[in-house]
């Protein structure tokens, strides 16, 4: 069974679009750009015969084939393609709740694990102050170099947040991490929360 659900209404709408292309065997290709990041976008494109990638996962539907990009498949889990009619005609919608969820485990590279915890545990708390922190690099055998932005840049509490919140959380979650270092220019207090 496929990771994605294409409703009958979406199937019929897409089949009608494909029939107008006058290309026998044309299907669709579903993929996610920048999967597992906050910038992830789920896309559907025409896929003429021969344009599919060798590692795509073909999903045979009643009227056409949908090719799922192999890299995108884990991020398409629980995805739904639907078509809803309205007074203006209708709209094709794609809901992929896992598109932006990083896929990491203890074997993932250290920078991916750091980014995962920054996005899922640290930044949601900082967002309440209009701030965020991002990974610049990992140096010196396990020191995470971080940069604050938004309300955290220039904030008088940034050092406390760094040591008591961010560093503690990351060290608990990533045993081989040795510490964190802030490279933010905190002299710019224009957007500072405190």
From Swiss-Prot:
Binding residues for [4Fe-4S] cluster: 152, 155
Entry cofactors: [4Fe-4S] cluster
UniProt KW 4Fe-4S keyword: yes
InterPro entries referenced in this protein's UniProt entry, alphabetically: Fe/S_biogenesis_protein_NfuA (IPR017726), FeS_biogenesis (IPR000361), FSCA_dom_sf (IPR034904), HesB-like_dom_sf (IPR035903), NIF_FeS_clus_asmbl_NifU_C (IPR001075)
Keyword vocabulary terms for this entry: 4Fe-4S, Iron, Iron-sulfur, Metal-binding
Role according to the record: Involved in iron-sulfur cluster biogenesis. Binds a 4Fe-4S cluster, can transfer this cluster to apoproteins, and thereby intervenes in the maturation of Fe/S proteins. Could also act as a scaffold/chaperone for damaged Fe/S proteins.
Family per similarity comment: Belongs to the NfuA family.
HAMAP family, per database record: Fe_S_biogen_NfuA (MF_01637)
Protein's name in the database: Fe/S biogenesis protein NfuA
UniProt source species: Pseudomonas entomophila (strain L48)
Annotated gene: nfuA
């Amino acid at each position: 069974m496929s990771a994605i659900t294409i409703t009958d209404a979406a199937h019929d709408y897409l089949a009608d679009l494909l029939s107008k292309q006058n290309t026998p065997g044309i299907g669709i290709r579903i993929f996610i750009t920048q999967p597992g990041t906050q910038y992830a976008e789920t896309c559907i494109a025409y896929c003429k015969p021969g344009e599919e990638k060798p590692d795509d996962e073909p999903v045979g539907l009643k009227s056409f084939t949908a090719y799922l990009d192999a890299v995108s498949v884990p991020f398409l889990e629980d995805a739904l393609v639907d078509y809803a009619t309205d007074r203006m005609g209708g709209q094709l919608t794609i809901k992929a709740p896992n598109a932006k969820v990083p896929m990491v485990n203890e074997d993932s590279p250290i920078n991916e694990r750091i980014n995962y915890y920054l996005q899922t545990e640290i930044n949601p708390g900082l967002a309440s102050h209009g701030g965020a922190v991002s990974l610049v690099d990992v140096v010196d055998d396990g020191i995470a170099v971080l940069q604050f932005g938004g309300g955290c840049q220039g904030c008088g509490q940034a050092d406390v947040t760094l040591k008591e919140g961010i560093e503690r959380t990351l060290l608990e979650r990533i045993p081989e991490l040795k510490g964190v270092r802030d490279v933010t220019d905190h002299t710019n207090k224009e957007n500072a929360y405190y």
